[in-house]
């Protein structure tokens, strides 16, 4: 999606100017995950046909932009986008309006929101619309509703997700896996508050450079902020007692809740929310330990993505360099950048460069992952930071008794766990691997006469911590099988009189695979192994065939 966004933004600007020429009053343009949007004052009605007519109008050669606003014929239209710039080289001619709806930025205002896409060639537009049709079939928002995983409620607030029991099960499994990865690297897990005085954000630089996303309030004369990052809190834990060179590296991990005030037009299901959980980690270490630490992080990151079935061709690291707005000296930035380059080169990974896309406090390695629909998602990040240790005056005692500054590394492998859930749901089309599935087995007794045996099968699985359910014979067997498939259940066990008398089950798996006369204990043993190994494929049914 990222590669399309510059031409979409240019298309939105062009359409906004043409709408002004038609007498309408657009107030803002911006980008969503899959399209552009234009908000228009709703004091006059606007139809799809009228928008389409505006598309075909002549376009100004040079778009008048001042202070991130379109300034045209006395109108000022805000450009709600800070990552994509408007290119004079792009010339979108082929538009598709996807949706026109009512948008309420607050209770007292109402706009008409136009969503669409724009491309330079007709072929690009056709290809995208074909892809979009496939993508809509696997939209995580629809899957989440269908599988009863999560929900959003306006009365709770935009961009604030409520995970239901089945959705929380998926999150718990992801967290348990990452805990094992963290343990293998020597991390110590911590917990920090959701709210801090803004003093620490002022020291860190977030207060100035991240101010538009900070949620700030005053209580009893002090100013507080809901945390957008976990790093300052981990720094305070490091500072809580003296450290020596023998203590380093010190690795803290946290499944930390963070909150960022994203603009309402940018919110999109779990992919863009205002509150989420990061699999966050911070390492404090000596300069001489940096390269090996980065190499280990790169190796573990690739290992994690392989576990989810992503191949080497689906994993692409990028080095992101110093942005225009940053803190720290040229010398520190050069040191940090060179450390990342060395680790990438020694890891043997081919990597790209993203100029000026580093964090404000240091350069970083970002990993992009390609899903089953061919989309690239930025997920993992590894960031070297010489600046925050300086700002917070972090120290350790060297072997010579001299106080020195540690280096700090920020890292997250999933990134946002909530966002990663969305990506997995779309990547697997709702059919998650068995270990991640909220319901792993559903037992279907053919008649009520075998309910006792079916319940024994169910309870034996639950004793072994397998997430199993039973669907009694209230509907036809074929209907219950279809329900289980539609709800993403990996394994269905069908039991009738024959199975009850022989201690067997009929196993059905995805892909309409059926294996009869399977000893229940054998199935159970294989399933436990599949789950314990976190296999992506259904290895149990493969072993039974």
From Swiss-Prot:
Stored Gene3D superfamilies: Anticodon-binding domain, Bira Bifunctional Protein, Domain 2
Entries under HAMAP family matching the protein: Thr_tRNA_synth (MF_00184)
Gene Ontology MF term list: ATP binding; metal ion binding; threonine-tRNA ligase activity; tRNA binding
Places the protein is found: Cytoplasm
Enzyme class of the recorded protein, top EC level: ligase
Pfam family, one: HGTP_anticodon
This protein's encoding gene: thrS-cat
Binding site for Zn(2+): 231, 282, 410
GO cellular component assignments: cytoplasm
Keyword set, alphabetical order: Aminoacyl-tRNA synthetase, ATP-binding, Cytoplasm, Ligase, Metal-binding, Nucleotide-binding, Protein biosynthesis, RNA-binding, tRNA-binding, Zinc
Xref: InterPro entries: aa-tRNA-synt_IIb, aa-tRNA-synth_II, aa-tRNA-synth_II/BPL/LPL, Anticodon-bd, Anticodon-bd_dom_sf, Thr-tRNA-ligase_IIa, Thr/Ala-tRNA-synth_IIc_edit, ThrRS_anticodon
Catalysis: reaction(s): tRNA(Thr) + L-threonine + ATP = L-threonyl-tRNA(Thr) + AMP + diphosphate + H(+)
Protein's name according to its UniProt entry: Threonine--tRNA ligase catalytic subunit
Needed co-factor(s): Zn(2+)
EC number(s) given by UniProt: 6.1.1.3
Source domain of life: Archaea
Task performed by this protein: Catalyzes the attachment of threonine to tRNA(Thr) in a two-step reaction: L-threonine is first activated by ATP to form Thr-AMP and then transferred to the acceptor end of tRNA(Thr). Also activates L-serine and transfers it to tRNA(Thr) but cannot deacylate incorrectly charged amino acid; unlike most archaea the editing function is found in a freestanding protein.
GO terms for biological process, alphabetical: threonyl-tRNA aminoacylation
């Amino acid at each position: 999606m990222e590669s399309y966004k510059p031409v979409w933004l240019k298309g939105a600007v062009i359409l906004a100017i043409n709408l002004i020429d038609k007498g309408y009053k657009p107030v803002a343009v911006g980008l969503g995950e899959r399209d552009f949007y234009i908000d228009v004052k709703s004091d006059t009605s606007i139809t799809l046909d009228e928008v389409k007519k505006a598309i075909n109008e002549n376009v100004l050669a040079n778009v008048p932009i001042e202070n991130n606003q379109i300034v045209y014929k006395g109108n000022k239209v805000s450009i709600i986008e800070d990552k994509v710039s408007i290119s004079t080289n792009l010339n979108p001619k082929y538009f598709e309006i996807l949706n026109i709806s009512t948008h309420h930025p607050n209770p007292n205002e109402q706009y008409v929101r136009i969503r669409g896409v724009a491309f330079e060639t007709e072929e690009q537009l056709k290809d995208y619309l074909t892809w979009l049709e496939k993508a809509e079939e696997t939209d995580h928002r629809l899957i989440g509703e269908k599988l009863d995983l999560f929900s959003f409620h306006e009365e709770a607030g935009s961009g604030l997700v409520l995970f239901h029991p089945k959705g929380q099960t998926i999150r718990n499994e992801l967290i348990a896996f990452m805990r094992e990865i963290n343990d293998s690297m020597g991390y110590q897990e911590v917990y920090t508050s959701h709210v801090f005085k803004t003093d620490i954000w002022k020291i860190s630089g977030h207060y100035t450079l991240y101010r538009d996303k900070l949620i700030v309030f005053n209580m009893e004369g002090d100013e507080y902020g809901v945390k957008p990052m976990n790093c300052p809190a981990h720094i305070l834990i490091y500072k809580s007692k003296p450290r020596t060179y023998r203590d380093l590296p010190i690795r803290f991990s946290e499944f930390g809740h963070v909150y960022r005030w994203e603009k309402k037009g940018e919110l999109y299901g779990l992919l863009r929310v205002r509150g989420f959980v990061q699999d966050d980690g911070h390492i404090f270490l000596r300069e001489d330990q940096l390269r090996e630490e980065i190499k280990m992080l790169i190796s573990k990151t690739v290992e994690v993505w392989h576990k989810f079935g992503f191949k080497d061709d689906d994993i692409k690291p990028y080095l992101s360099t110093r942005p225009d707005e940053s803190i720290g000296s040229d010398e520190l930035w050069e040191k940090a950048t060179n450390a990342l380059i060395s680790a990438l080169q020694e890891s043997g990974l081919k990597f790209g460069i993203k100029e000026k896309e580093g964090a404000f406090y240091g350069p970083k390695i970002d990993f992009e992952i390609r899903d089953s629909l061919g989309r690239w998602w930025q997920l993992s990040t590894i960031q070297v930071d010489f600046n925050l240790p300086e700002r917070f005056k972090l120290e350790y005692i060297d072997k010579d008794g001299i106080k020195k500054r540690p280096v700090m590394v920020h890292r997250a492998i999933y990134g946002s766990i909530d966002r990663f859930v969305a990506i997995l749901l779309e990547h697997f089309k709702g059919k998650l691997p068995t270990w991640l599935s909220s319901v792993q087995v559903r037992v279907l007794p053919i008649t009520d006469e075998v309910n006792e045996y079916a319940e024994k099968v169910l309870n034996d699985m639950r004793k072994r911590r397998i997430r199993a359910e039973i669907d009694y014979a209230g509907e036809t067997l074929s209907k219950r099988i279809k329900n289980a498939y539609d709800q993403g259940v990996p394994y269905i066990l069908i039991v009738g009189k024959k199975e009850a008398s022989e201690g067997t089950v009929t196993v059905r798996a995805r892909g309409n695979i059926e294996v009869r006369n399977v000893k229940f204990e054998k199935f159970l043993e294989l399933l436990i192994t599949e789950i314990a190994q976190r296999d992506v494929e259904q290895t149990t049914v493969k072993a039974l065939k």
